[in-house]
Amino acid sequence: MLDKYSPAEIESKHYQNWESQGYFRPDMDLTKPSFSIQLPPPNVTGTLHMGHAFNQTIMDGLTRYYRMKGCNTAWIPGTDHAGIATQIVVERQLAAQNVSRHDLGREKFLEKVWEWKEVSGGTITQQMRRVGCSADWTREYFTMDGVRAETVTEVFVRLYEQGLIYRGKRLVNWDPVLGTAVSDLEVESMEEQGSMWHIRYPLADNPTEAVIVATTRPETLLGDAAVAVNPEDERYTHLIGKELILPLTGRTIPVIADEYVEKDFGTGCVKITPAHDFNDYEVGKRHDTRLINVFDLEAKVLANAEVFNFKGEAQPGFSLPEKYAGLDRFAARKQMVADLQEQGFLVEIKPHTLMTPKGDRTGSVIEPMLTSQWFVAMSATPNGGEPDNEFKGLSLADKAKKAVDSGAVRFIPENWVNTYNQWMNNIQDWCISRQLWWGHQIPAWYDEAGNVYVARNQAEAEKQAGKTGLTREEDVLDTWFSSALVPFSTLGWPSETDELKAFLPSNVLVTGYEIIFFWVARMIMMTTHFTGKVPFKAVYIHGIVRDHEGKKMSKSEGNVIDPVDLIDGIGLDKLLMKRTTGLRKPETAPKVEEATKKLFPEGIPSMGADALRFTMASYASLGRSVNFDFKRAEGYRNFCNKIWNATNFVLMNTENQDCGYGATAAEPRGHSFPDMWIIGRLNQTIEQVTQAYETYRFDLAAETLYSFVWNDYCDWYLELAKVQLQTGCASRQRATRHTLLRVLEAALRLLHPIIPFITEELWQTVAPMCDAKTADSIMLARFPETDGGEIVQTAFGQMTVLQDLIGAVRNLRGETGIQPNVKAPLFVESADDLADYLKYLPMMTRLTEARQVAALPESGDAPVAVCNGARLMLKVEIDKAAETARLSKEAEKLQKALDKLNAKLSKPGYTEKAPAHLVEKDKADLAELEDKMAKVQNQLAKLKD
């Protein structure tokens, strides 16, 4: 007998043992097929969220499956230094002590960051262990550790020497609060209600005539370089090439023609400010306008405009109106709008809905800013220094395109190839510099004249310069730069290691679609460029985990479910505290609290890691999003309990019994058709589950396993086994025990990749009883293989007959309202001999006996059913009046429910306006009620006959 199922107890016990025994490490036998997978490195600042739990369940499931298939298996874990995120956390801690990073200086500040990383950095990897991740922790890396730092420097220097890294003036996303450039991924577009200002720009040669320019950003007017109109817009063709007076400045700017301008948007005249708008930058580049920067790095108006050409060369500047100098951009907007109105330039202000770019860390409005940055050239051809391979001589972008076009890297689902190619065909040079302190400091040094020397260290730079006293570049690299090198920086490159031979390319990358461009594409570029190999053979793109209503999970919205809370459980009070702290809108706290109480009235009970993993596996379809339903997790907790209880039943009936193993393995075993059926179903399940794992369809694997274990094994075979163990001969009983153990042990191995803890615990007891303990751990045991010879169709046919008979008797009992505790005799009239089937019916359908007769006895009231040509009669007296009353009451209740639901669905506009999933549920409920009503009406009709 097993103790009560306690997930917490078995999880801690087994994980500790797996890790200490070294089971997660590859054996590095290069004669064996390899399976490797890279963990998308989570931020070192992070804690586990549902997205992590989702993709880590898939990754761990694959790793465990291929390990059991005998592969040399490596799942390589690591964490990302997360430049901006980490620096913000530490700066906030210092701010609480009234200290800034500038007070400390760079060196002391970085010491503080490393201290914080050592204390807090391991949280997420410990939580990964809680989920059961069988990663090789001996290979764990940090993207700023010594090995990775050397690789980053080597890659940077080589790219620079190949002409693929350069420094130049470019427009970037600038966060004025952080004081750094940020990537597109770190910018959120927020819909806001704003204004559209219509401003007069007078003609220089005729100030009484003017064009009306519509803009949402009047504060950038000081940096205007032109006004653009559509060349096909007849209203303005006569003005193309003319000069306009720029309001508030007295400067003149030209009217230019560009198809970028939409004739029907606003007034059809657009101010072009190339130094403060990405679209304007492209227009300005086409027309070779000036780049006029009017803001400093804090987004305050400069006293003197900085002017450049599109080669990044400084041009003569000019002074800006003195009254705006030093004003924050939004204060400047307010003042300038007032001045425009006062001077007669403001025509009107219209309300306008716009998308405002905001920094995801600070919430500040992102400013397109012209700054000196380091870039990786995406479309330039390297000038040598590449390894000799099929990708040699191609630009980084073309390498990444070829890898996918050739099929060397495939996307799952395939439709993501279109998204990938669309981005690759519109790729821009990659801005890799960040104005931060935490990160890989760019390996470049400057002399007093501003000459740059890129080198692996200062001594090498000084050798290049032929002098000392050089100054190191202060900027650090974009976090994605070091992340892009992970496929080979974790395997010993630039040395030719066994790890590189065995594990590059890895088999699959499991990730979300939001970082296809920022990480996936760049890994393909860097890996093909430096190794001549692709980083991975497949990219499995999974959906985003959302809440049960399909909303994005966000701490600021109060709808986050912490995976660890699902594993361990959490009381309502603590859950409410977690969900109402840090809300974006604190005033929504009562609403969040109400929703939480409704969803989790008693908090979240402990589910255990296995139930969480099975839930995640069941959601791993090829869709774009996953609506997480807590009820499903509860259902899979029950499934784990079902497996535990089924094992208990098997042990109770096999321990210290003759099971046909060991000493009695050669003794005859009289397999019944239920034995042959469940063995056949096991083999079918092995085939289906293997196919599902191989094609990354964990949802199908979970569905198949659930159906086999719960329905076939527990609900059918265990119940039939009870009959065989009570009534069968010694040979039949031996065969039944043999089958009980054999099928259970194989099922545990099939389940192990998804639910590793409970399967390990049970396998350690079950496997020795059926001579299947071939390894110290289930994770090292072989994955089951199909034996087609054991799929016996006659047994399947016999089982169908038995299931039909049992179903018919159960329906007969239900239709006539026979109480579960009432036993009755069953008489069966059939031309076929049904003796092999009838012996199972008394226990399975609560009968006193099941007897085959030449003809059914005379009985006017006894219920009769027909099943596959056989006539079945339950010999039981029925109180017609009482049964009619019961069914009539049931029909009345069903009719009320039907009327209510029909009224809801026929309400004008309901099916069009209500959420689709609610409408579908209502329609499904209606169909179910109609089916029940039809059955009740049928039973009433029979009683009247």
From Swiss-Prot:
Recorded name of the encoding gene: valS
Alphabetical keyword list: Aminoacyl-tRNA synthetase, ATP-binding, Coiled coil, Cytoplasm, Ligase, Nucleotide-binding, Protein biosynthesis
Catalytic activity: tRNA(Val) + L-valine + ATP = L-valyl-tRNA(Val) + AMP + diphosphate
Motif ('HIGH' region): 42-52
Segments forming a coiled coil: 879-945
Subcellular location: Cytoplasm
GO molecular function: aminoacyl-tRNA deacylase activity; ATP binding; valine-tRNA ligase activity
Family affiliation: Belongs to the class-I aminoacyl-tRNA synthetase family. ValS type 1 subfamily.
Main location: cytoplasm
Residue window of motif 'KMSKS' region: 552-556
Function: Catalyzes the attachment of valine to tRNA(Val). As ValRS can inadvertently accommodate and process structurally similar amino acids such as threonine, to avoid such errors, it has a 'posttransfer' editing activity that hydrolyzes mischarged Thr-tRNA(Val) in a tRNA-dependent manner.
Gene Ontology CC entries for this record: cytosol
Annotated SUPFAM superfamilies: Anticodon-binding domain of a subclass of class I aminoacyl-tRNA synthetases (SSF47323), Nucleotidylyl transferase (SSF52374), tRNA-binding arm (SSF46589), ValRS/IleRS/LeuRS editing domain (SSF50677)
Organism expressing this protein natively: Neisseria gonorrhoeae (strain ATCC 700825 / FA 1090)
Source species taxonomy: Bacteria, Pseudomonadati, Pseudomonadota, Betaproteobacteria, Neisseriales
Gene Ontology BP, a term: valyl-tRNA aminoacylation
One Pfam entry name: tRNA-synt_1
Domain remark text: ValRS has two distinct active sites: one for aminoacylation and one for editing. The misactivated threonine is translocated from the active site to the editing site. The C-terminal coiled-coil domain is crucial for aminoacylation activity.
Subunit structure: Monomer.
Xref: InterPro entries: aa-tRNA-synth_I_CS, aa-tRNA-synth_Ia, Anticodon_Ia_Val, M/V/L/I-tRNA-synth_anticd-bd, Rossmann-like_a/b/a_fold, tRNA-bd_arm, tRNAsynth_Ia_anticodon-bd, Val-tRNA_synth_C_sf
Positions of ATP binding: 555
Protein name per its UniProtKB record: Valine--tRNA ligase
E.C. code: 6.1.1.9
